[in-house]
Amino acid sequence: MCGGAIISDYAPLVTKAKGRKLTAEELWSELDASAADDFWGFYSTSKLHPTNQVNVKEEAVKKEQATEPGKRRKRKNVYRGIRKRPWGKWAAEIRDPRKGVRVWLGTFNTAEEAAMAYDVAAKQIRGDKAKLNFPDLHHPPPPNYTPPPSSPRSTDQPPAKKVCVVSQSESELSQPSFPVECIGFGNGDEFQNLSYGFEPDYDLKQQISSLESFLELDGNTAEQPSQLDESVSEVDMWMLDDVIASYE
């Protein structure tokens, strides 16, 4: 069945109502847009998805609000870095970017005092880049203000420890003397486990005199330099060699 057949069937009814016969062109012109949509089935589909039109309207409203100049989001507090306590006091705090924590600045009676405390701390932490509540005012810190702790920088490191350099001569003099054990002579046991230390500064004469006293020779020979050569000849040479070898 085509569209022309439907119109031809519909035409006699119209002629009876109005008393004259209408053509197909007149019938098409009299049909409104809603009837045409209903005739071809478009009206029923729009009824099934009414949310599309609502979403389009909401997006249009949002775009208009975004494009309106001069309207900004209203801040909860008038000043930066402050908040009101339930009992009426005003607290001030600031975030330290170097430590990554919020630093407590104190509690104040008014919002202006808390805002000034924030400005002082922001100036110390961020310097000239800080966003202040009162950029045109130069004010001292308010009462009950707790300054933020200063974080150590790389330039404040303690100086490096100095390396102590000791010359070779000083190190040799500072070495302790090692005792030289002497072996007992004869069958007696009174000379065992005796030791005498010979330091590097002793000369040969002092070593010989100490050896003579160890052998219980005449005490006058150690006091008289003229008789030193005679006493040396009386000492066995092998014993003197052992002493010198142990010293080396």
From Swiss-Prot:
GO terms for biological process: cell death; ethylene-activated signaling pathway; heat acclimation; positive regulation of DNA-templated transcription; response to cytokinin; response to ethylene; response to jasmonic acid; response to other organism. Its main location: nucleus. InterPro entries: AP2/ERF_dom, AP2/ERF_dom_sf, DNA-bd_dom_sf, ERF_plant. Keywords: Cadmium, Cell membrane, Cytoplasm, DNA-binding, Membrane, Nucleus, Phosphoprotein, Transcription, Transcription regulation. It comes from the Eukaryota. One of its GO terms (molecular function) is transcription cis-regulatory region binding. The modification Phosphoserine is found at S151. Residues 140-151 have a biased composition (Pro residues). CDD domains: AP2. Residues 60-70 have a biased composition (Basic and acidic residues). Residues 78-135 bind DNA. GO terms for cellular component: cytoplasm; nucleus; plasma membrane. Mostly expressed in stems and leaves, and, to a lower extent, in roots, siliques and flowers. PROSITE patterns: AP2_ERF (PS51032). Induction: By 1-aminocyclopropane-1-carboxylic acid (ACC, ethylene precursor), methyl jasmonate (MeJA), and Botrytis cinerea. Also induced by cadmium. Residues 60-79, 132-161 are annotated as: Disordered. PANTHER family: DNA-BINDING DOMAIN, ETHYLENE-RESPONSIVE TRANSCRIPTION FACTOR RAP2-3. Interacts with TGA4/OBF4, ACBP2, and ACBP4. Belongs to the AP2/ERF transcription factor family. ERF subfamily. Probably acts as a transcriptional activator. Binds to the GCC-box pathogenesis-related promoter element. May be involved in the regulation of gene expression by stress factors and by components of stress signal transduction pathways. This is Ethylene-responsive transcription factor RAP2-3.
